[in-house]
Amino acid sequence: MLWNTQYFRIEGMISLGWPRLAKTSILKFVPIAQNHRIRKMKVQDDFILTIDDSEDDIHYDDYDADAVDEEMPSNVELKKKSKKATPAKDSDFNGEFLFEADVNKDLSSATDMNWDFDMGSKTESNRASNTVDLDAIISRNRKPDDDEFPSSFPSEEELQEPEQENIDSDDEDLAIDGFGAGAIAENEDESSQDESESEEEDDITEPVPSFANISTQDFNSDSAAGSSDSEEDEEEIAKKNAFFAEGDKEKSMMTTTHSSFQSMNLSRPILKGLSNLGFEVPTQIQDKTIPLALLGKDIVGAAVTGSGKTAAFIVPILERLLYRPKKVPTTRVLILCPTRELAMQCHSVATKIASFTDIMVCLCIGGLSLKLQEQELRKRPDIVIATPGRFIDHMRNSQGFTVENIEIMVMDEADRMLEDGFADELNEIIQACPKSRQTMLFSATMTDKVDDLIRLSLNRPVRVFVDNKKTTAKLLTQEFVRVRPQRELLRPAMLIYLCKELFHRRTIIFFRSKAFAHKMRVIFGLLSLNATEIHGSLSQEQRVRALEDFRDGKCNYLLATDVASRGIDIKGIEVVINYEAPATHEVYLHRVGRTARAGRSGRAITLAGEGDRKVLKGVFKNSSAQNTKLVNRNLDFNKVEKFGKEIEELEPVVQKVLDEEKQERELKIAERDLKKGENIMKYGDEIRSRPARTWFQSEKDKQASKASEAKDKKSLAKRKKQMEKEEVPRAYKKTKNDRLSNKKSTKKSKSKRK
């Protein structure tokens, strides 16, 4: 017998079968209007309502049978179920009913786990308790008359006017510290004529159109080896053309341009996610990469920093995953990043674009809870974003996680991964993944070191090079402050002057040393400059908290090493300051690429000393080719010297703060070790019964790989020194001066013969 459930609903799980149930059990009919009460009770109490043979009746809380009888119509008839739909009545539809999007927001769900580090800080409370509160130590040692932080800053127009007046009025300091003349000066003691010429050239107050005072001989002497090495013979070019796929179809797809993402025939959930992020028009790298990636082609991509490489591979991956078979969940996409911060940013972009889909994204990086990551991987997320070391750890030791079904593999910033010593890890991951996968390799700088990795991991890839190898953003203004040898000790004071007098917000300052970055963090705090730091000596929670504070505007200055020089995209960064020029031009590009991103303007300032000539020559050479802005910045050295004296007076206080921080850290480490010993005594058998975690390399293999890398570096350095000693004429294109000098020498030789 079937009951018409238009007005009633049978509650309970039936496990006995209908004949027996009709004889021994009593069914209770619940009105549809009260269904939401029972559903809510199920969620809260977490049990299933069943019917037992021994029960005479089923009692529901907040349920009135008389009220049901009153609501029940008198003319209810039992009918057989028919395929025809019953006519709708006015009472069937509740006009006041509303769909609520956040009705289950209080319920915990595994898919809602966003690694937003409010959660990370809770799960890692033990680790967070081991950190030292540096701000509290600094506030205890700061002078009582110092203000915490300035409440308001002058506007940008107010800042620019006195700066311009300062540059025009102080001609003497400009002649001493202007950077234009010093680019070719080899010795400080030159003739008075040369000094007067350099003073005239130093009187620069506006952007320098081209550094003509740097001779071409300086470029040729330093970069002759690079130019000769970069010239490829015909055989090498033929090999590359045979390896890369550059047919008519690929070329036609790369030449076509898309005015918007909608013209790419993307799905509506992806377009909605892009529009929520404010992405409307694709960048050049996205315009060329997305159609090729949707076809499943292997891609080698290179573009300038801030050009949108992350979205260039995230969008086609999500589009392809929308059409995946959903019956059996499995991990299909692997994205490898060199640093934790870059992986976090990539995860954030992927989750936001995929917010209107059912695609699961998992983040696996060091510094986070290993157990939480294992739980996420057991659910087999569609996309795994990881650093190479942590991914190999999960690949070998996490139960239920395999890479057999990986269909797409992405290596972001591949050259950085190779530079950081991840070559062995990448080879291990590549060999473990299926060969039939699609592989995409992206980087801002595509060097020759990546060639071996490309040949090992990619199959007939398409090259997508949007800009030159060494380019900066068009709206980036590059400024240089020359630091003379006699003023080298005033570098910290110059930095404080720039931050106190000129740039008050959204500024990243790069250092070469972690220890010095931490020391400057203490000095900034003592001088009431609101700053935070990020480098490799900090825990993952501290690094993430620093990025969050800087992004949210709680801190105005971010003191960083090259950990933050790649991929970190924080909206609205106005200024990047290089405390020292970096070791290579590539690192310089990544540092200054933190500003002037996605079509916005920015400013990069470099404190350049005498030892930074080689890097700066590369910067000047590329800027003349790009016609970008290069500015000579002059500082008010009266104020700089005042800041220098103030920093010198603070030196004992800085040392006291560092010693106090060290003592607190040692105390917390001792407490942690004590707790660890207690846990071993209590749960020793359980701890020893756990399976040991394995690695793909033994200690001997690690040492051998490190030794081989060091040997390669030494042999490379020796080769360069030998090439510099040998006076072998290098093959390069003759300039006009070379031709004139050759003509003069031939004329002299002919006249001597006569």
From Swiss-Prot:
First-level EC class: hydrolase
Region (Disordered) location: 121-237, 692-754
UniProt biased composition (Acidic residues): 155-175, 186-205
Organism: Schizosaccharomyces pombe (strain 972 / ATCC 24843)
Domain Helicase C-terminal residue range list: 475-641
Protein name: ATP-dependent RNA helicase drs1
Coiled coil regions, renumbered to chain: 655-728
Motif (DEAD box): 412-415
GO annotations of cellular component type: nucleolus; nucleus
Binding residues for ATP: A303, V304, T305, G306, S307, G308, K309, T310
Keywords: ATP-binding, Coiled coil, Helicase, Hydrolase, Nucleotide-binding, Nucleus, Ribosome biogenesis, RNA-binding
